[in-house]
């Protein structure tokens, strides 16, 4: 994931900052507790494609 891209994209739900989880290849919105997938290196920033983060993932 290009760090320059991370600086300009935002969560489609709350417009908050997204964090890249390299291990899971997901963009994380901590505010909404959502994880957006990457497909072929392209972020899929659709709310219906996101998965809810588990309690363990939000409180490491």
From Swiss-Prot:
Native source species: Cronobacter sakazakii (strain ATCC BAA-894)
Similarity remark: Belongs to the UPF0434 family.
GO cellular component: cytosol
Protein name per the record: UPF0434 protein ESA_02427
Gene3D superfamilies referenced in this protein's UniProt entry, alphabetically: 2.20.25.10
Organism superkingdom: Bacteria
Taxonomic classification: Bacteria, Pseudomonadati, Pseudomonadota, Gammaproteobacteria, Enterobacterales
